[in-house]
Regions:
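Solvent-exposed, amphipathic alpha-helical segments
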Residues: 15-22, 65-76, 110
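N-terminal intrinsically disordered/low-complexity leader segments
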Residues: 1-5, 78
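Alpha-helical DNA-contacting segments of helix-turn-helix folds
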Residues: 56-65
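Amphipathic alpha-helical packing segments from all-alpha helical-bundle domains
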Residues: 91, 95-106, 119-129
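Short, hydrophobic secondary-structure boundary micro-motifs
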Residues: 112-114
Length: 129
């Protein structure tokens, strides 16, 4: 088996992100992505296993981290004594929401893919992460 050429995966992912943003998952073409990246569809299949694997490689890291932020906020809130939770609910809700919104804007294109371009994937709803 040949060794992957350095920089090709990054080029594929850049071109894939553009194609998925432009056309959504269902209408995106691996041939177009490969041509734009200057490689072959075989190269994409060997690296990612196919279109769904490529889409997952783009969105899964950010989706998992987003979920971890959400869970972390919930866990911190649960550590507050139950009788004091009502006093801190607004603060935790606002701070947690801001953390999640900041993260989404820091990874805006990825969340565009999740919201607008994920139909046909396991990511069609954020809760499938």
């Amino acid at each position: 088996m040949s060794k992957p050429i350095e920089g090709v995966s990054e080029k594929i992912e850049t071109c894939a992100k553009k194609e998925f943003l432009d056309k959504g998952y269902v209408d995106a073409s691996l041939r177009t992505i490969a041509a734009e990246a200057g490689t072959t569809t075989g190269s994409i299949y060997s690296r990612y296993g196919g279109k769904e694997g490529l889409f997952s490689a783009l969105v899964e890291p950010a989706a998992k981290e987003f979920t971890e932020i959400f869970v972390s906020v919930q866990e911190k809130f649960q550590k507050i004594e139950p009788e004091k939770q009502a006093d801190y609910l607004d603060e935790y809700a606002e701070n947690g929401m801001m953390l999640m919104l900041d993260y989404m804007y820091d990874h805006f294109e990825i969340f565009q893919l999740l919201v607008d371009g994920a139909y046909g994937t396991n990511f069609k709803t954020l809760w499938n992460i």
